[in-house]
Amino acid sequence: MSEETFPQASALTLLSDPNIDLLSLVAAAGEVRMTYFGRQVMLHRINDIQNGLCPEDCGYCAQSKISDAPIKKYPLKSEEDIIQEAYEAKAKGVYRYCMVSSGRGPTAERTEHLAHIIRRIKNEVGIQTCLSAGLMDHEQAAVLKEAGLDRLNHNLNTSESHTPDIVTTHTFQDRINTLKAARSAGLDLCSGMIAGMGETDQDIVDIAYQLHEYQVPSIPINFLIPISGNPIYDCNQLTPQRCLRILCLFRFVNPKAEIRIGGGREGHLRSLQALALYPANSLFVEGYLATRGHSVDQVYQLIHDAGFEVAGETSLTGDLSATSQFQLDDNPNILNPQTTISFSNS
């Protein structure tokens, strides 16, 4: 399948038509994924290097100025803490270390400080890096590029028409301008969406094709995590099946992109998480910004149970041997009261 051949009408039908068999859809998306990425899954870890204290009014975000979510707010972590956590991420087999800082965007002084930290991480730790720090211009992006930053994240989050319903302190064009600034500075782009914020099928399709237009190589698909205190709490749009259809849509429209299962994976995909690895080839470990997530061990198990492999896999996979086979031991605490186990002397 070429990137130019998936029509928008088919994309809309894919999301809305219950007669399109879900497993057949997942299998077809899996064929596209296998063509470009094989069976490898890239692991990313988020480090929320500054939490809260944000002047923006994004309705979905626990860090925004209008949220009453009970989060722990803190200023930028120390340089040594950020670097130490990069070492820890690498030791766990993480492919890319993603630093996220709250706020509208960094000052010139903050940009230089972040560049210094990135330079140390690249020189001392040797891990792929991504930074999400809000709105930026070309000069700021160029400073980060010179420091060795591999990728800049700035999510579109939703379509241009739906953006005013989500946030009023910045525009959709502001976000596009940040992506353009990053690209002009030579940085790889990372940009995706949040599903479940009251958007229509057309909104989702619009985002998928907008990211295709900009040839974004890394696309995180987040599913709204309903955090009490946020204005956009729960639109009751998402089911495991719909989440899978959204992931398949993005794979068909952006066949060569790294499609990442982002926030909300555990709660919205639930028992269908393994199926999501057919359209997607990347996911986060150990949580997101304001919420916890599956541990590295749980993610490794999920990937291996589904028949995939971790990109750049380390010796961590050796730990799976002890849990790869199900065994029922003689511990009475896990037995049904009607079940007895007899042991022969032979």
Swiss-Prot record:
InterPro entries noted in UniProt: Aldolase_TIM (IPR013785), BATS_dom (IPR010722), Biotin_synth/BioAB (IPR002684), Biotin_synthase (IPR024177), Elp3/MiaA/NifB-like_rSAM (IPR006638), rSAM (IPR007197)
Q: Please, which domain of life does this record's source organism belong to?
A: Bacteria
The pathway to which it is assigned is: Cofactor biosynthesis; biotin biosynthesis; biotin from 7,8-diaminononanoate: step 2/2
The UniProt keyword set, sorted, is: 2Fe-2S, 4Fe-4S, Biotin biosynthesis, Iron, Iron-sulfur, Metal-binding, S-adenosyl-L-methionine, Transferase
Locate the residues binding [4Fe-4S] cluster. 54, 58, 61
Q: Name one GO biological process term.
A: biotin biosynthetic process
- What positions does the domain Radical SAM core occupy? 36-265
The Swiss-Prot or TrEMBL record annotates one GO molecular function as: biotin synthase activity
Name of the top EC class for this enzyme: transferase
Enzyme Commission numbers on file:
2.8.1.6
Co-factor remark:
Binds 1 [4Fe-4S] cluster. The cluster is coordinated with 3 cysteines and an exchangeable S-adenosyl-L-methionine.
Question: According to its UniProt record, which reaction does this protein catalyse?
Answer: (4R,5S)-dethiobiotin + (sulfur carrier)-SH + 2 reduced [2Fe-2S]-[ferredoxin] + 2 S-adenosyl-L-methionine = (sulfur carrier)-H + biotin + 2 5'-deoxyadenosine + 2 L-methionine + 2 oxidized [2Fe-2S]-[ferredoxin]
Q: Where does [2Fe-2S] cluster bind?
A: 98, 130, 190, 260
Query: So which cofactors does this thing need?
Result: [4Fe-4S] cluster; [2Fe-2S] cluster
Looking up SMART domains in the UniProt record yields: BATS (SM00876), Elp3 (SM00729)
Write down the PANTHER family for this protein, in alphabetical order.
BIOTIN SYNTHASE, BIOTIN SYNTHASE, MITOCHONDRIAL
Family under the similarity heading? Belongs to the radical SAM superfamily. Biotin synthase family.
Q: How does it assemble?
A: Homodimer.
The UniProt function text for this chain reads: Catalyzes the conversion of dethiobiotin (DTB) to biotin by the insertion of a sulfur atom into dethiobiotin via a radical-based mechanism.
Instruction: Give the protein's recorded name.
Output: Biotin synthase
Q: Which organism is it from?
A: Acaryochloris marina (strain MBIC 11017)
